[in-house]
Structures are given as structure tokens and as C-alpha cells.
């Protein structure tokens, strides 16, 4: 099965040569997602909860555009800039995954823009 590009309506243009998501053989791969506006400016600069909510809502749009739901998520890669935000990020994260949780990892690192606090990349398997 060929790869399909997933670009939800209203998506901003990426900062680099990639798309928000791809679908291949029932698997959705969501690119690393940050809390950006339409012009790639960071939203909610000092608010890890608001950034996490925006990131996960954006990821949900990509997965729904591909025909799935957040319940289809099997793996998340989470990148945060400061461990002090870990609990706040997890609080919002848990709202998006109330049932069985997907596998994940979380590391502290620098992100592409200084005001970005969290970035998440996702894999989801859509049931056929």
C-alpha cells in the first residue's frame, strides 16, 4: 500500500521539509509537533499545560484526518525542555489518554524554538 500524506485543514507550513503526518499500511506517523500558530510562532510561551494541550489537539487532528482516534495511539516520543514541567505535561497528557495508555518515552532536550516547552511525535495503528 502506498504512503498517504496527512495534512489537516488549517495546518501551518512546516519549518523544514516534512508533513504533519503520513499513513502507510494502517499506521499513522505524526511528525514532532509543537505549540505553533499558523505562522510558526510559539503559543503559550510560559505555560507547559497549554502547550501540551495544543500539541495533543494538533496530533488528534492529524490522526482523525487519517481516519483514526486517540485510542489508536500506540507510541509517543515526548521531548521536554525542563523536568520541572514534567508533572504539568503529564496532567494534560492523561486527559487525552484516559483508558489504556500508549507506550512512550520522555527526554529533556533543547527544542527548535527557545519558547517551546514540549514536542511530541506519535505513532497510531488504525483498525481496519
Swiss-Prot record:
<comment type="similarity">
    <text>Belongs to the RutC family.</text>
</comment>
<comment type="function">
    <text>Involved in pyrimidine catabolism. Catalyzes the deamination of 3-aminoacrylate to malonic semialdehyde, a reaction that can also occur spontaneously. RutC may facilitate the reaction and modulate the metabolic fitness, rather than catalyzing essential functions.</text>
</comment>
<dbReference type="InterPro" id="IPR006175">
    <property type="entry name" value="YjgF/YER057c/UK114"/>
</dbReference>
<protein>
    <recommendedName>
        <fullName>3-aminoacrylate deaminase RutC</fullName>
        <ecNumber>3.5.-.-</ecNumber>
    </recommendedName>
</protein>
<dbReference type="GO" id="GO:0005829">
    <property type="term" value="C:cytosol"/>
</dbReference>
<dbReference type="InterPro" id="IPR019898">
    <property type="entry name" value="RutC"/>
</dbReference>
<dbReference type="GO" id="GO:0006212">
    <property type="term" value="P:uracil catabolic process"/>
</dbReference>
<dbReference type="GO" id="GO:0019239">
    <property type="term" value="F:deaminase activity"/>
</dbReference>
<comment type="subunit">
    <text>Homotrimer.</text>
</comment>
<dbReference type="GO" id="GO:0019740">
    <property type="term" value="P:nitrogen utilization"/>
</dbReference>
<dbReference type="InterPro" id="IPR019897">
    <property type="entry name" value="RidA_CS"/>
</dbReference>
<dbReference type="Pfam" id="PF01042">
    <property type="entry name" value="Ribonuc_L-PSP"/>
</dbReference>
<keyword id="KW-0378">Hydrolase</keyword>
<dbReference type="InterPro" id="IPR035959">
    <property type="entry name" value="RutC-like_sf"/>
</dbReference>
Amino acid at each position: 500500500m502506498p504512503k498517504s500524506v496527512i495534512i489537516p485543514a488549517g495546518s501551518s507550513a512546516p519549518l523544514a521539509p516534512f508533513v504533519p503526518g503520513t499513513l502507510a499500511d494502517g499506521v499513522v506517523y505524526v511528525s514532532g509537533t509543537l505549540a505553533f500558530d499558523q505562522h510558526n510562532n510559539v503559543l503559550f510561551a510560559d505555560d507547559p499545560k497549554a502547550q501540551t494541550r495544543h500539541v495533543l489537539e494538533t496530533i488528534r487532528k492529524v490522526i482523525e484526518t487519517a481516519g483514526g482516534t486517540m485510542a489508536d495511539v500506540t507510541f509517543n516520543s515526548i521531548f521536554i525542555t525542563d523536568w520541572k514541567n514534567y508533572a504539568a505535561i503529564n496532567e494534560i497528557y492523561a486527559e487525552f489518554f484516559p483508558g489504556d495508555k500508549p507506550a512512550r518515552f520522555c527526554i529533556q532536550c533543547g527544542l527548535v524554538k527557545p519558547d517551546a516547552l514540549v514536542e511530541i511525535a506519535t505513532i497510531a495503528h488504525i483498525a481496519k
